[in-house]
Amino acid sequence: MKDLKLSNFKGKFISRTSHWGLTGKKLRYFITIASMTGFSLFGYDQGLMASLITGKQFNYEFPATKENGDHDRHATVVQGATTSCYELGCFAGSLFVMFCGERIGRKPLILMGSVITIIGAVISTCAFRGYWALGQFIIGRVVTGVGTGLNTSTIPVWQSEMSKAENRGLLVNLEGSTIAFGTMIAYWIDFGLSYTNSSVQWRFPVSMQIVFALFLLAFMIKLPESPRWLISQSRTEEARYLVGTLDDADPNDEEVITEVAMLHDAVNRTKHEKHSLSSLFSRGRSQNLQRALIAASTQFFQQFTGCNAAIYYSTVLFNKTIKLDYRLSMIIGGVFATIYALSTIGSFFLIEKLGRRKLFLLGATGQAVSFTITFACLVKENKENARGAAVGLFLFITFFGLSLLSLPWIYPPEIASMKVRASTNAFSTCTNWLCNFAVVMFTPIFIGQSGWGCYLFFAVMNYLYIPVIFFFYPETAGRSLEEIDIIFAKAYEDGTQPWRVANHLPKLSLQEVEDHANALGSYDDEMEKEDFGEDRVEDTYNQINGDNSSSSSNIKNEDTVNDKANFEG
């Protein structure tokens, strides 16, 4: 029998099975920390331009961004373009993942994203007045965006596939919540450096992106690939080793082999499906099209319900629509970002207890009411009404941090099928960045024309989101990714909506998932039904166990020992 060794698993450039010498919960904690680092970088980028775009030194270095009067349309367009060009880069990165993500794997994409982010930040930081400075800054923003697009499309999928069903939502919610903490850090750094009368005022905040990216890069170099992805690439031995490592169990344990067999079987249901974009939009029992549209809708409505209009331009909103002076607007913007970060704490308790569906509904309803208050107060401008408008903004960011901040990053990889999970998540993330670009580009122009009209538009979009959630979003809390496949297949067979099936279908064990899959005929249309008979998992189990039963105890080779010694040292 073949002797499994970790050295046999190493690729040409990176190891897919390295794990810092950690196992079980400690390894999962490290995976969570790496994911949080990636999304805190994303949040930092979101908050970065809020105060910089109208900062004195930034406007001096890039004169085209300086407004001359309250209705300088040219300057507001340049401000919008300088801020939103980042989203175009993010879109390009997400598009790359959608087409190539399944072939490359989760870990290499995150490493690539980190390196590209560093390159982009260096380009932007080194822009100097008189040397096509604004063009260089924008190019750096776009390059940074490409790196962020790779990371935001990949990290949620990677962490979802590395997590247990019972705490998957909590762990992915942690990474989403760190977006708010990254934004808060950016706001307060911008405020602190606003007293500086040199280019350090904007260069230091921009260069801080490098620090976040370096931390993510350092974590990821020795964190493992997703076992589900390894199985999809017929690298079952590596997957079995990693499942045992994540469970802190011997790869020969019956539970480990059974889990790998179930994953193997789930992946093989679509093994013969062609690797093309058309797979993402297939229908039938897989319902990939419906799942992709649901995933994309979470990101579409996250943007068009007003979150980044408030986050990217909070200082501008307080200054222009609520008529606070610039310095006070920056302070209130910092408080705004702090409340945003603190509001995410509540989501840790609600994400599993309340569930995804109810939390979506709570968030959309609360945001709709909040923006209704803001727009109503701004119709007739005076000092008292301005305070009411500010209250509406603070209520909005509280509801957003509690719900719709994290959910669009948790939900898409949960509802996607294994074969197109990376593509589905990338498709939803592409939707995010296109909508994000539109909102960030046109919000300053919209505000300049009609402050209250801007909030009325976002309030209406929030009200429209409520029926979309109610009629199309199934509950996924506490369910394995394979159970969710069953929900959509059963909805197709019964001619009903997935949310109805999810409400009535009890939680399933691994064997019950397989029984339902056989009963529903959840196999690829190009394959024969007999390939998925009731003994399939048992056959897979016997094959995996028989091929490798005597070998896995030898997995700890010299490389693993050295890695562990170096880490502990």
Swiss-Prot record:
Picking any one GO molecular function of the record gives: carbohydrate:proton symporter activity
Record-linked CDD domains: MFS_HXT (cd17356)
The regions listed as transmembrane in this protein's record are: 30-50, 80-100, 108-128, 130-150, 169-189, 204-224, 292-312, 331-351, 359-379, 390-410, 427-447, 454-474
- Region Disordered, annotated ranges: 524-569
Ranges per topology, Extracellular? 51-79, 129, 190-203, 313-330, 380-389, 448-453
Per UniProt, subcellular location reads as: Membrane
Pfam families documented for this protein: Sugar_tr
Would you identify the family this protein belongs to, as annotated? Belongs to the major facilitator superfamily. Sugar transporter (TC 2.A.1.1) family.
Question: What is this protein identified as?
Answer: Sugar transporter STL1
How is this protein positioned relative to the membrane?
Answer: Multi-pass membrane protein
Compositional bias, Basic and acidic residues, is annotated for 556-569
Instruction: Quote the cellular component terms of the Gene Ontology held in the record.
Output: cell periphery; fungal-type vacuole; membrane; plasma membrane
Instruction: Return the Acidic residues bias intervals.
Output: 524-533
Q: Which residues lie on this side of the membrane: Cytoplasmic?
A: 1-29, 101-107, 151-168, 225-291, 352-358, 411-426, 475-569
On the tree of life, the source organism's domain of life is Eukaryota
